[in-house]
Amino acid sequence: MNICIVVGARPNFVKAAPIIRAVQAARQKGEIINGELVFAGYEDDKSIEPSLFDDLMMPHPDTYLGADSDNLNELTGMVMSKFEQYLDQHPTDVVIVVDDLASTMAASIVAKKRGLLLAHLVAGTRSFDITMPKEVNRLVIDGLSDLLFTAGVSGNSTATREGAGQEKIYMVGNILIDSLRHNRQRMVRPADVIPVRRSSARTRARSSIMPKGFDI
């Protein structure tokens, strides 16, 4: 099975990391599964610091589509064209899109037009404000998806109310927690990095707000 995970912005990598690790773990157990990470943007995207992938303990994207535009409709068209080219060169069985960006909506449309199995991570999220571009993206992606991975009961309820069958809905929980747990042992408390004498700090804070001549 060949899986393609599509992300469109920096925050999406935090949610994609647990999926990448799950694919790697399955391969180590002997399962025939391959996973590729596709980023809609450029390799030198300024919003992505060099340490991000090391911090998340995940590999860098396998492919950068290089799509970028301030116009969301133009960006959608660019991603559709570039993702189509990617799929022409990379046999894919399942496409997993993360979140609700224009780029992930574009990838969803291409995947379904090619008859691929489509899964949406963080499905069922709604603002109920159709004037928001992301709300349009959510409706399109969820409507096209074969599998809806929701974060909680509210997501399940939304998907059901909009006509999704129970066989499509999987409540996977808040996947950000998976990343948090995975990195828990590596976390350092601020107090361990910058020692602070709490009593003196508290005294200085109090003295800064006391009237002159007031004895503390």
Where is each model-derived feature located?
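Short internal beta-strands
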Residues: 35-42
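Short N-terminal binding/cap micro-motifs at the start of the first secondary-structure element
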Residues: 12-16, 45-47
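Active-site and donor-binding regions of nucleotide-sugar-utilizing enzymes
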Residues: 4-6, 14-22, 28, 52, ...
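Hydrophobic anchor at the start of a short beta-strand
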Residues: 30, 35, 118, 169
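N-terminal beta-loop-helix "entrance" segment that forms/cooperates
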Residues: 42-59
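Conserved hydrophobic helix-helix packing surfaces used for dimerization/oligomerization
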Residues: 3-5, 35, 95, 198-200, ...
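A nucleotide-sugar donor-handling region in carbohydrate enzymes
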Residues: 42-43, 47, 66, 144-216
